[in-house]
Amino acid sequence: LLEFEHIIQVNDLGNEAITVLTREQLWRGLALRAQEPDKFNQGLSCSYKSLSENEFLRTISTGESSFYERVVLTPEVKIHTETTGDSQQISAESTAEIEEPELNSLFVRFTYKRELGDNNSEINIGEHLKSAYVQIDQDAIAMIRVLAESNLFDQAIN
């Protein structure tokens, strides 16, 4: 079992060269990533079915593999994702939670828990996954920043 978390600083209030994102902008970006992860990772295709205003089931396909997940949104706070149903897929869950220790000082805490499978190879799969998660999350925050600075959220959604 891999259990891992990391934090990304979104706003550096001491660096005037970086635009300060609002909590709403950050939330819009994180929610967009949850609903349409294929806009953040071109190797994916995604479809989803709404269960309620803040909950949906999504299917993410990459190559010949598909993953089925339940996603629960707590608006402007966190997004929780958990695999569902199919016994052929690994059990996994993740959370992206906005933290604001002081006004406009935004961070996102990413938490992951997943099975690693029975692969006993010499490669440390857990360390590779941790590195991949950090890179993907950093790229997502960078993309959210570009969308916010360029006022492109509405175009990205369509």
Give the residues covered by each predicted segment.
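Beta-strand elements of well-folded, non-transmembrane domains
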Residues: 10-12, 64, 112-116
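Hydrophobic/aromatic beta-strand elements that line small-molecule binding cavities or substrate pockets
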Residues: 8, 45-48, 67-73, 91-100
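Hydrophobic ligand-binding cavity/cleft-lining segments
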Residues: 1-49
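Beta-strand/loop substructures that line and gate deep hydrophobic ligand-binding cavities in soluble
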Residues: 86-138
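Hydrophobic residues positioned within well-ordered beta-strands of beta-sheet architectures
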Residues: 4-6, 56-58, 69, 81, ...
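Glycine-rich portal/gate segments that line the openings of hydrophobic small-molecule binding cavities
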Residues: 48-87
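Short, highly charged C-terminal tails/helix-capping segments
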Residues: 46-47, 145-158
